[in-house]
A protein has these predicted regions:
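Conserved nucleotide-binding/hydrolysis micro-motifs of P-loop NTPases
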Residues: 36, 74-78, 164, 194-198
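P-loop NTPase nucleotide-binding core
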Residues: 43-47, 51-156
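Conserved Walker B catalytic segment
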Residues: 127-195, 204-206
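Hydrophobic/aromatic beta-strand patches that form the interior of the parallel beta-sheet core
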Residues: 39, 69-71, 190, 217
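A short, basic N-terminal segment
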Residues: 1-39, 44
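Short glycine-/polar-rich loops that comprise or flank the Walker A/P-loop
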Residues: 64-68, 185-187, 212-216
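Short regulatory helix/loop adjacent to the ATP-binding pocket of P-loop NTPases
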Residues: 196-214
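Short, well-ordered alpha-helices that flank and scaffold nucleotide-derived cofactor binding pockets
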Residues: 31, 55-62, 179-182, 204
Length: 218
């Protein structure tokens, strides 16, 4: 049986050769990131936010000069879960990059030092933490951002379904995140959301911590 090459990819990462249209959006998002701007993307679910972000990350101007991270926080419901998700996905991305990157991550997260386990054959650290290990989420979050600030390349972190943080029981999560992010010089952010009303309010309502801090892509 001959191999079937289906250009209509509906799941997983979309190869560059199969990514159609969205030329203007790709160019704008890439340009904003190259200029060091944070970006908010507002679009309903299943309309291609994730594919657009990953396609942007694949652009030579980005992939050859930045460390890129994508984190989906749709299923999180608290700051503790947010930090757990962010930590686990950063580790998952860094692990294939080699021991230097993994050790940098492990040594940076001092609040978790006692909980690391190691592969008996390779000696590589393994991320086997439970949610309960993140007893000081704000401290761990600060350590993560400090690590990104010290990276030897500029970093881009895309957080999908960012509006979830407004639903956490903790009342100051937006302010906490903004407090960390505003001091970073080596890291840019993409905030993507599918709840257009809520995500728009977070970035355009006077008095909200992220008010007028980003460029917008609809």
């Amino acid at each position: 049986m001959s191999e079937i090459n289906n250009p209509f990819v509906v799941k997983g990462r979309i190869p560059a050769a199969c990514f159609c249209d969205r030329v203007a959006e790709t160019e704008k998002l890439t340009r904003e990131l190259l200029n060091g701007n944070d970006v908010v993307i507002m679009s309903s679910r299943r309309l291609g936010k994730t594919g657009l972000i990953q396609h942007c990350f694949d652009q030579p101007a980005i992939s050859g000069h930045y460390y890129t991270f994508f984190v989906d926080i749709l299923e999180t419901s608290s700051l503790q879960e947010f930090v757990y998700k962010l930590s686990s996905q950063l580790f998952e991305i860094l692990q294939p990059m080699g021991r230097k990157f993994v050790d940098f991550f492990v040594n940076s997260l001092k609040s978790l030092q006692a909980g690391w386990t190691y592969d008996p054959l390779s000696g590589m650290p393994k991320f086997t933490f439970s949610m309960g290990a993140f007893t000081k989420p704000e401290v761990t979050l600060g350590e993560i951002f400090a690590m990104l600030e010290l990276a030897d390349r500029r970093c881009i972190v895309a957080i999908d379904e960012f509006q979830q943080i407004a639903k956490y029981p903790e009342k100051n999560v937006e302010a906490v995140l903004r407090g960390f992010i505003q001091h970073l010089n080596n890291c840019d952010f993409i905030f993507a959301g599918s709840d257009r009303h809520l995500i728009a309010e977070m970035f355009s309502a006077y008095g909200r911590p992220f008010y007028t801090t980003t460029s917008t892509l609809n």
